[in-house]
């Protein structure tokens, strides 16, 4: 008996998340660990639960995630993007809700590259008049 699964890929900064939604009780597993153990801050847990809260599907799907690259904030954003795409696959009627909240939009902001002659992307060395 094949189990129904919905897939979504999310990206944010340097992070990529491959998300599977399986009908279940609402457990979130990230790279084989529980979400509360994986993320150090509560805000990241709130970020990844946003699409489920918007569509009122908390507790109806188990979320299985493989995420790599970037830091915790980028990974949380990538997971949110992936969950939103997977929910859209599960029920296309969620599109208007997810789109209006901005969860289907790929956040294109990236780290600006460092330029030569500068200390960071825009930070110039200290100016000395004499």
UniProtKB/Swiss-Prot annotation:
BP GO annotations: translation
Name a single GO cellular component. cytosolic small ribosomal subunit
Q: Which Gene3D superfamilies match?
A: 3.30.230.10
Please list the GO terms describing molecular function.
RNA binding; structural constituent of ribosome
Q: Which of UniProt's keywords are assigned here?
A: Ribonucleoprotein, Ribosomal protein
InterPro entries, per the entry: Ribosomal_Su5_D2-typ_SF, Ribosomal_uS9, Ribosomal_uS9_bac/plastid, Ribosomal_uS9_CS, Ribsml_uS5_D2-typ_fold_subgr
Q: Which Pfam families match?
A: Ribosomal_S9
Q: What is the similarity comment for this entry?
A: Belongs to the universal ribosomal protein uS9 family.
**Annotated PANTHER family:** RIBOSOMAL PROTEIN S9 (PTHR21569), SMALL RIBOSOMAL SUBUNIT PROTEIN US9M (PTHR21569:SF1)
* Identification of the protein by name: Small ribosomal subunit protein uS9
Species of the source: Oceanobacillus iheyensis (strain DSM 14371 / CIP 107618 / JCM 11309 / KCTC 3954 / HTE831)
């Amino acid at each position: 008996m094949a189990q129904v699964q919905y897939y979504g890929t999310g990206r944010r900064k340097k992070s990529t998340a491959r998300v599977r939604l399986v009908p279940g009780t609402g457990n979130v597993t990230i790279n084989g660990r529980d979400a509360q153990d994986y993320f150090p801050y509560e805000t990241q847990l709130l970020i990844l639960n946003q699409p489920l809260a918007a569509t009122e599907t908390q507790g109806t799907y188990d979320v299985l995630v493989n995420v790599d690259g970037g830091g915790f904030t980028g990974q949380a954003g990538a997971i949110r993007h992936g969950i939103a795409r997977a929910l859209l696959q599960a029920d296309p009627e969620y599109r208007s809700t997810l789109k209006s909240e901005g969860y289907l939009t790929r956040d294109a902001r990236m780290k600006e590259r460092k330029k030569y002659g500068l200390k960071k992307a825009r930070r110039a060395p200290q100016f000395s008049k004499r």
